[in-house]
Amino acid sequence: MKSLKVLACAACLMGTVSGVGFAKDVQTIAGSMVVPNNVNIVSASKTNTRDFVEKQMQQNPSKSTMTNMMAKEFFQNFGTNFDVYQLQGADKTGQKDAFVVAVDVKQIAQKVAKDKANDPMFVAAMAALDKGQIDPVTEQLMLGAINKQIPTTTTVVPLNDPKRYANLKTRSGELLIKPRTLTVENAEQVHPVAGTKYQTYAASSRLLYADGNVQTPLYANAAFVLKPGKPVLYVGVTTDVQRDYFKTIFDNAFKSIK
C-alpha cells in the first residue's frame, strides 16, 4: 500500500506541473511519439517526481538498505531507461486522464538477470534485442508461447495470500490485510502491428483491481517496440470508463514511435 500511495502522490505532483502546453510530437525514451493536438502530455522525469520518491524512500525505515540502493540506482536512469508520462485530454463528458509507463527492456533484463549473462538463450535474446528484429519463425514460436498464457475467459488472479495474515486483525476483528486480486477480462492476444518504423507487438485488456471491497476497473494497452539496441515496453493505463477515449490514442501513439 505504501508504494501505491507514493505513486498516487507522484501522480499528483505531475498533474500540478504548469506551462507544459499542447504537443503533437512528444519525445519518449525510444523516440518521438505522436498524440492528438488536444491531448496534453508531461514526462515524470521532467518534474520533481524523482526527488519526491527518493525522499519517501528515506522516510520509510521498513525498506531494506539493499532495496533502497536498487531503487536509487533505478532512478538514476529516470528519463533514459524508464519514464512515466501523464496524458490529459477532454471531451464533452469532461477531463480524461491516463498514464503510460515506458521501460527499456534490454537494460532492465541485463540488471535483473546478471547470473544468466553467459546462458546461450539469454545471449541470443540480447542479440535479437540489439538487432531489433525477430525472424518470422521465431516470431510465431514466441507469439504462440506468450498467447497460450493469456486468459481467453474472465480470470481472477490473486495478488496476495490473506491466509498468511489471518492473525493480523483490527480491534473490530476485521482483517488488517485484505485480499487483493486482479481480474483479467477481454484480453487481447499479442499481435504484430503493421505500418511501424520498428517491429512492434501489442495487446490490451480490461482489468479489475480489487483490494478487499474496494474495486477499481481499469484498462491497459501495451506495446513492445523493438528499436535496435533500445527495445522499449510501453504500458498505457486508464480507468475503464475512459477506455473508449484512450484506446485509439494509445494505439496510434505506440504505432507512431520513430
Q: Where are the predicted features?
A:
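Bacterial N-terminal signal peptides that target proteins for export
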Residues: M1-A8
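Short, surface-exposed beta-strand/loop micro-motifs that present aromatic residues
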Residues: D83-G89, T216-P228
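Surface-exposed amphipathic alpha-helical segments
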Residues: A30-M33, V39-N40, P228-K258
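N-terminal secretory signal peptides
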Residues: V35, V39-S43, T47-R50
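Coil-to-beta-strand transition motifs
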Residues: Y198-T200, Q215-P217, L226-Y234
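Sec/Tat signal peptide C-region and signal peptidase I cleavage site
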Residues: S18-D25
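Conserved polar/disulfide-associated segments of primarily extracytoplasmic proteins
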Residues: K46-G212
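Bacterial N-terminal signal peptides
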Residues: A8-T16
